[in-house]
Amino acid sequence: MFYPRPYLSASQLATFKKSKKDYFKTYLLGEFYGNKYTEFGQWVHAELEKPESTEIIEIVRTAIPHYTDRELDILTNLDGVPLKGYIDLVNKEQGIIADIKTSKNEFTQKKADTLEQITFYNVLAELYLGWTPKKNYIHWLETAEDENGQLYLTGHSKTIETKRTKKQIDDLKKEIPLIWQQIGEACDKELDKIINNTI
């Protein structure tokens, strides 16, 4: 079977489950180019990694607790399925993982509790780090637009703790191999359509 990426990520999983059409456009055809919001989020992550930065980034840093690891790049395997993910923040001593989100609209508890990305990261932590996170956090950073449409951080932030049960983690671990199989089969069919339409 053909896979657009040699691994499964949280974003792939979410996109495929939401819309196969969007998955094909994004990962098979490469038609997703991002937007100013995703680009701004990437910029914030990059700025937080620098030893020195702007005043607003320093304000943000003070709002986020200390973590032993930042931008932890994980590549692991679950029942033959290669999994990849970037966990923004990890505190190994306290068993904590966290993700940074930027948006104009405030991140809610409900959204945090239903975000499958966090469950996926719990799976990665179990497989790669060897432990199940005791706590999961979302660090939300508020953004706004100036008169020219440029995004900036307001300095307002919010930290949300969200829990994941063993059942939620185990259910996703059971689902991942099934979704991986479905992705391969769906991509094979889509490629056949593309090839037949070009003949």
Predicted stretch roles:
Residues 32, 36, 108-113, 164:
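Conserved aromatic-histidine-acidic binding/catalytic patches
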Residues 21-28, 98-102, 152-158:
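Short acidic (Asp/Glu) and glycine-rich catalytic loops that position anionic groups and cofactors
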Residues 30, 103-105, 142-145:
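Short, solvent-exposed loop/turn segments at secondary-structure junctions
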Residues 26, 46, 96, 120-127:
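Residue-level signal for well-ordered alpha-helical scaffold segments within enzymatic catalytic domains
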Residues 7-8, 79, 126-199:
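Metal-dependent nuclease catalytic regions and adjoining charged, substrate-binding loops involved
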